[in-house]
Amino acid sequence: MEVTDDDIKKMVSSLADRLYTYAHFLTEFCIKVTQRERYGQKDKHFFYTLLFKATNELTAVGVLFKNFYEKAALQGGMYLILRTVLSDCLAGWHVSRMRENGEDFNYMIDLIHFDHVNFSIKSLSGPYNQINRLPPQELEKQIQSIKSANPAFFHSTVDDCGKTIYRNDIFNGEFYSLKRTITYLTQQKLNDEEKGLLNHLFYYYDLFSKLEHPGMLTFMLVHKGFDPRLQERSLIDVAEALLAIEPVLYEYMLNWPELLEHSTEFHKALKNLHIEARSLIAALKMRPIEGQ
C-alpha cells in the first residue's frame, strides 16, 4: 500500500499530539514531586532538575514538530532543543549507572554542577578580562565572590583578619565532559538494547551539534527543512531521537516509584508515543528518502 504525502502529514500531526500529551503527564509528575518535596537528596534533586528541564524542552519540540511542514524555519530550533535533551540524557545516564554500580555518584553530580562555576571563573579571568581589562585587585575580588557563593567546591583558609580566602577547587583539575561520560558508559557491560540506546543518544546529539557549532555541515543542516528531498530524513531523525530520550526520562521517574504505581493514563500515553513514532518511521522507510 502506497504511503502518500497526506498520510505522512497526518502521522506527523498525530505524533506531535502524542508528544504533547506525554509532556503534559511529565509536567504533572514534576508538580507532584515538588508538592511533596521529594527531591531533597542530592541525586533526586539532580534527576528532578533534568526531568523538569526535559519536560519543558519536549513541550517546545511538540509545538515545533506540529508545524513541521507549515514553518520550515522552525526545524532548526527543534534540532537544537533536542540536542540539549540528548546531552542531558547522556549525563543523567552516567550518574544513574554510577549509582547502580555503588560508585561515588555524588562526586560526579558535584563535578557536573561545578562546570558552571568553573566556566564562570575561567571566562572572567580569560575572555571577559581581555575585553574589560579589569585591575588585578578587582579581578581577584570578583573571582573570590564567585567562589564564596559556592564554598563547597573550594579549599579555603582564613587570613590574619579572620577573612575566608578561597583557593583551588576540590577536584584537583578534574572537570566534567561528554567524552568522560561516553568513555564511562562504553566501559559498562551493556546489553544489546542499552548499546542501541547509547548509539542513538550519541548519534543524534552529534548530528544536531553540527547545527549548534558552525562547520562544513552547517550549510546543509540550516537548509534541510526547506529541501523536500531531506525533510523525510529529518522526520526519522526526530522520531528516533524521541524514542532514545524516553527511556532515560523514565529512569529518572523511577526515583519516585510511588508516583508511578497507579499511573495507567501515563503508561497509556507512553505506549501511544512509541506506537506513533515507530509507525511514522516505518512509513517513511517504505518511501525513497534522500540520504537514507
At which residue positions do the language-model features occur?
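Long, hydrophobic/aromatic-enriched structural stretches that serve as scaffold segments
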Residues: 36-97
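Internal, hydrophobic cores of structured domains that mediate oligomerization or house catalytic pockets
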Residues: 77, 82-133
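Short, glycine/acidic-rich hinge or "gate" loops at secondary-structure transitions
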Residues: 73, 97-108, 258-268
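Secondary-shell segments that build the walls of catalytic and ion/ligand-binding clefts
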Residues: 1-48, 113-242, 246-292
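Intrinsically disordered, low-complexity coil segments
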Residues: 66-73, 100-105, 188-197
